[in-house]
Amino acid sequence: MVLKTSQKAGSFLLALVMLLSLTSVFCFKSASAATDGEWKYELENGGVTITGFIGTSRTISVPSKVNGQRVKKVTALNNNNTKASVTTVSFANGIEEIGTGVCKGYISLERVALPDTLVTIGSDAFFNCSSLTGITIPNSVTTIGTNAFNGCIALISADLSCKATVIPDGLFTGCKSLTTAALPSYTTDIGVAAFSGCSSLASINIPDTVKTIAKDAFNGCASLKRISLSTELKTIGEMAFKDCTGLTEIFIPNKVKTISEEAFSGCTSLQNAYIGSSVSVIKKYIFSGCTALKNIVFGGDYYNFTDLSSTAVTGTYTYYPSKYADGWSHYDVVNMKSYSAPTSVAISGTTEAAPGAKVTLKVTATPAGGEFNNVYVLKSSNPNVAYISDDGTIIARATGITTITAYTVSGASASVTFSVTPDKPQNLTATAKTTTSAELTWKEIPNVTGYNIYRSTSKNGTFKKVGSATTNSYTDKGLSKGKTYYYKVACYVNSDGKQALSAYSSVVSVKAAAPAPAQISAKKA
């Protein structure tokens, strides 16, 4: 029995040793932290995650590979005092994620180069990089974390032409040197204090996809004189534009439902506020401290005037559509007047332009004679093709097609298609190939989708499209022998399912006939 017990004990100890051995091996494999030159890294998810930089260079170039493995993620760089001296950080193509706080507190960092493969920028990634002057977010980025550039006090410009739909909380809070910011065309939400304290921000284009502007989003943007709000906007948060002391006018679009507390309080230069017909909830103190406010013009028939009354300013007049006069008579808000609200609007003028051209469209509201018929906003569906300047001028930027829409405070609107057209084809020639075909050639136009070819049987007759080409030549077949044909060509760019068509080339003619035979010489035998 004693022998058997000893055998059992020995077997148990042997099994325990083997288990501990396997466990230690397993633990070693899971703890894959390693170093390769200046880089600390871990292997995970089929790639490398860089967890630290142990070099001393002031210029850091994060590689695409470490120890032969592709770098996918960076979670940390300098974790010591040398980070204060780093001036440049570049991330190689292939990197998909920059983690939380990677460059936080790099106070000497002046330049950052982000890769075209980047998808995610973590929270606080460049927090308090107080020497950074500019940033371009690649198109590939879909997610930006909160406070990513918070406290970058030297930042002048930010290009966020990426796929992110949310501008996160605190993204540029305290970036007091920021003058311009291009938001993603996919943006739906602008987060809490996203641009709070950006006191040099002079202009910003809010895409028409934005539905929510959160609390304090633009609080303290003292240089903003005018802002064009999204036509899809539904909610303006508390103190969203508080202390925007340069703002002189605001137009609330016709899908906004709620304007929250103190939304425009402290806007000491604000003179006119136009509030769209869709607004049904107006919270307290939205115009508190707006000492220059002259007119509040409503476009609709219902507002919470009890809350609005607490924002009354001496000398301010409130206007409402005359058809709702009886409904407002019992409210004691501020000086009230009625006006003839536009019921329709029309746009006229040139709707084609070359890149770089400036165009002014005429907007006419009816019935004529309304006090605010000249108050409207213009919007471009594709600002990359043409955008609207602060004075309402349309600036043609690149070939394509956009829709220009005019909106009035009462909700009336009208749209026109606006084309930015390429240069017309030059040096068109036509040569008879056979008795039934002709070859056309012309000078190639760069950056166009293709060319349309038009034919007529008389120079001043009706031209009909006979074909298209993607190169600068075309052979027209099926002609009648001995007949003269006239041709012209236009080039085009595809845009939003339509063609932005250039002006026509000059007209050329050709007679369908076999080309003359080559001269033949022969010697007498």
Question: Which residue ranges define each predicted feature?
Answer:
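Sec-dependent signal peptide cleavage junction
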Residues: 22-37
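Consensus positions within tandem repeat domains that build extended binding/scaffold surfaces
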Residues: 100-102, 123-125, 145-150, 168-173, ...
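Extracytoplasmic soluble-region selector
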Residues: 339-422
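Pro/Thr/Ser/Gly-rich low-complexity, intrinsically disordered linker/stalk tracts
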Residues: 422-447, 481, 497-525
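Beta-strand-rich modules
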Residues: 476-497
